[in-house]
C-alpha cells in the first residue's frame, strides 16, 4: 500500500490541507494504511509551514550549542547522513548537514520530499496491513540572512498547532515549551489524537541551527498505541525505539563510529 504522496502530488502550503484517506481495516477492525497516509501527509504540511514561517525572522542570533561530542553507536543500528546528492529545489536550497542512528529494523525513505528523510517502525498484521508504531521525519527551517533564535520558535509552534488541529481527528495539544534533543536546545509541542479507537501521539521539536548557520531542523515524531512500550504522549521520544534516534542526532555530516 502506498502511504505517502506519489510523485507529482500537490505540495501543500499554509492554508492548503490534504484530505483524509479512507482507512482500510483488518479482520480485527484495526485501522491500517489510511491513517498512516494521513499522518505522513501532515508531516509534509508541517515541513512546508516550517520553511514558510521562519522566513520572517531577521537579526536574530543562534543560541545553539556548537561544541558537542560524537554520539555512541547503539547495537543493531544504521547511520543516516544527510547528503546533497540528488537534492533539488527547496531541499537543495535549504540543505542542512545532519546525521543520526536508527534501528536496523526500521524502514527508511530518504527522499520523502519535502522532508529530507523519514524512518518508520511498523507493525504488519496477518492481512498484510501495516500500522505506524513510531515515525520520525526531518525537515528544514530557515531564516533570512541570519540564524534562527529559539525566541521565534513559539510563533512557529502556533502555526503548527493550527494546522495539526485541522488535520487530526480529536486533536488536542497537551504541552508546549523548551526542550532538549541530545545536546541541543529547542522548542516543542506535543499532542494527542484518536481515530477509530486508535490513539496517536505526536511531538514536534524545532532546533535552531548552530552559530554561524541559518538553517535549523524540524523533527516530527508520530507514535501510536500499537507500540507496546508507549502508553501516552509523554512517552514519545522517551520510551520505545525513538530515543536511539534522538540521542544520536547531530548537526554536521557525521561519521560512522
Which residues make up each language-model segment?
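N-terminal targeting sequences that direct proteins away from the cytosol to non-cytosolic compartments
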Residues: 2-126, 181, 198, 220-257
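Conserved polar/disulfide-associated segments of primarily extracytoplasmic proteins
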Residues: 73-76, 94, 111-231
